[in-house]
C-alpha cells in the first residue's frame, strides 16, 4: 500500500534523522561554497533567498557572508532545527518562512541571489521562471544528475526487490533555460558521503526509504541485513555515491 503521508508530515519525519549544520570547513557544503566562489559567485553583502532550506546546512553557511538570508521550507521541524543552530551560531541576519514555494509571497522584498539545493520545491518550469524573476543577480541551483546511491539502502532494495528511484532533474532545467535563451554555467559535482549511524538511526533511515513499497516480508529483512553491516561497536557506516550539477544563471 502506498504511503499517503502529506509532504509536510513527510519532511517533519525526515527531520528526525536529517543531517544538520556543522561549522567544519571539511564538509560538502563548505566545498560547494568554495566552488561557487571560484565561479565568481559571492554571497558577501547579498540579500539571499534559500528555497527549500531544510535544516539549514547551506542557509547558515551563506548567512556568514550575506547581508540577509530568508529560508523557506514546508517543514516546521526542519525550520526548528535551523533556528536552533542559528541561535548557537549567532546568525541574527537569518529569517525563515514556513510555506511551499508555490505559496511564497515576497511581499515586495528584493533578493540578489536565489539559492536552491536538491529540493523538490523547485522542479517545474513555473518554478524555474519564478526563481529567475526573484533573483536580481544570480540563481544558484544544485540538482541531481542521475546518481544517488546509498550502499546501505541499495542492499535493502536488492533484498526486497525494490527498484530504486532515479534522481535526475537537471536535464529538465537545462532544457527550459535553452528555450528561454538564458545562458548558464554548469559545474559537475561527484561525491561519496561517508556517514556512520547508530543502529536505531540506521534502521529508521531504512524503514523510511522503503515505506512506500515494503511488504511485511521485506520489513522483516531489515534488521538481519543491518546485523551483517554493523561494526564491532554496533554502528553502521554507509557510503552514498552521488552525482549532481550546479547550474548558475
Model regions and ranges:
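Conserved class I S-adenosyl-L-methionine
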Residues: 1-42, 46-54, 140-165
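Class I SAM-dependent methyltransferase SAM/SAH-binding core
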Residues: 55-102
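Short conserved loop adjoining the S-adenosyl-L-methionine
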Residues: 103-108
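Short alpha-helix
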Residues: 166-181
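Conserved Class I S-adenosyl-L-methionine
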Residues: 185-249
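A short, conserved alpha-helix within the catalytic core of class I
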Residues: 121-134
